């Protein structure tokens, strides 16, 4: 009985240490540990106060959550990550998911942000329900792309598009891009997918993960998108042969 007590005490102390070291680990202040997923070792974090980190030109800011909305979005995020195999996030080096409100990147409102260096995703819980899961998968793909860049070196993604199509110079260079799903668009699942190659890949992956029935319907009518989906499948299978879309 005494041995069991010491084991429980050790686990509790370890839990507190992790919470106290959040600032040191991911360089974001005012966060507390909300939930630790044993299955995939993901830590869900929530802000106790608003936070602002970074320089004036490169910064991330987010606000403390409303508890009711936070709990719902936390459950939504859990359901989304359950679609991945247990060791998937270890492979892509994701350890922390921050859920907060009114996320901004360099002063621009954002739905999500991936920080590969800190092994962290930041998700805006103000995102509407239909887009929240897509945003999570979208940001997961950015981690895949960053940590497995070697898989992307020899692909010619832009060659799949119509010759006259040109991507924008950056993902925020236009105000015309939205996450609204579009059909028969000659290779694109949303307007935002038209911004850059990286965002196009992430948008395609996000819809494959969040609504596979819809993506199957879309590729039955869009040969360009069909090729993109096949390419994404092949890339992800290199990382995890058992991954299911």
Where are these regions (language model features)?
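Classical Sec-dependent N-terminal signal peptides that target proteins to the secretory pathway
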Residues: 1-21
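Auxiliary, metal-adjacent structural segments of Zn-dependent hydrolase domains
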Residues: 53-117
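Active-site-flanking segments in enzyme catalytic domains
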Residues: 96-245
């Amino acid at each position: 009985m005494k041995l069991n007590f010491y084991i429980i005490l050790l686990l509790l102390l370890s839990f507190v240490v992790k919470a106290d070291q959040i600032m040191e680990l991911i360089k974001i202040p005012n966060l507390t540990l909300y939930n630790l997923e044993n299955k995939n070792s993901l830590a869900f974090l929530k802000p106790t106060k608003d936070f602002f980190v970074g320089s004036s030109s490169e910064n991330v800011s987010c606000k403390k959550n409303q508890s009711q909305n936070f709990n719902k979005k936390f459950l939504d995020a859990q359901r989304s990550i359950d679609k991945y195999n247990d060791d998937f996030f270890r492979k892509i080096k994701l350890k922390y998911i921050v859920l907060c409100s009114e996320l901004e990147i360099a002063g621009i409102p954002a739905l999500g942000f991936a920080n590969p260096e800190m092994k962290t995703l930041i998700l805006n819980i103000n995102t509407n329900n239909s887009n929240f899961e897509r945003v999570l998968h979208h940001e997961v793909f950015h981690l895949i792309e960053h940590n497995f860049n070697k898989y992307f070196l020899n692909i010619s993604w832009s060659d799949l598009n119509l010759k006259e199509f040109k991507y924008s110079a950056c993902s925020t260079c236009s105000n015309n891009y939205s996450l609204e799903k579009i059909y028969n668009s000659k290779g694109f699942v949303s307007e935002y997918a038209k911004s850059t190659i990286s965002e196009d890949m992430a948008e395609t992956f996000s819809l494959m993960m969040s609504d596979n029935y819809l993506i199957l319907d879309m590729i039955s009518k869009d040969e360009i998108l069909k090729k993109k989906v096949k390419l994404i499948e092949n890339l992800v299978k290199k990382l995890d042969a058992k991954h299911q879309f």
